[in-house]
């Protein structure tokens, strides 16, 4: 035959490699600044990376217990510059909620006892599985208007915590 069959169906699927090549070309041409290039790469990583890659691990989570004395609470506030602390019954796997450091500091400024961590200061915490991608966590944060979550494994044990800023770094 003189004529060979040519595929006339167009493939409009764009792959990550296609986008990456365009980004690299844009960076080399000076159209994309280094910071913009890095930001775009990070957006694509959110789909691939799972929660454990960005969370604070269980061993590094600082938390309060319901029976914790006031001096211990003050010491943790001074030593760890966190904006939120988990509140647990007796151990980390017995999560009750979390407290915002601002609320505790207001209590200190008003000479109120810190021993009465109760419903007015303890907030409900978002609990997520460790199998989610960072993109899925971002969606959960957006839909619940939260910026902090406890990460659990398939046995409902706490494996860490993650914040919005952990994802954005």
Protein language model features and the residues they cover:
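Soluble cytosolic regulatory domains appended to membrane proteins
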Residues: 10-169
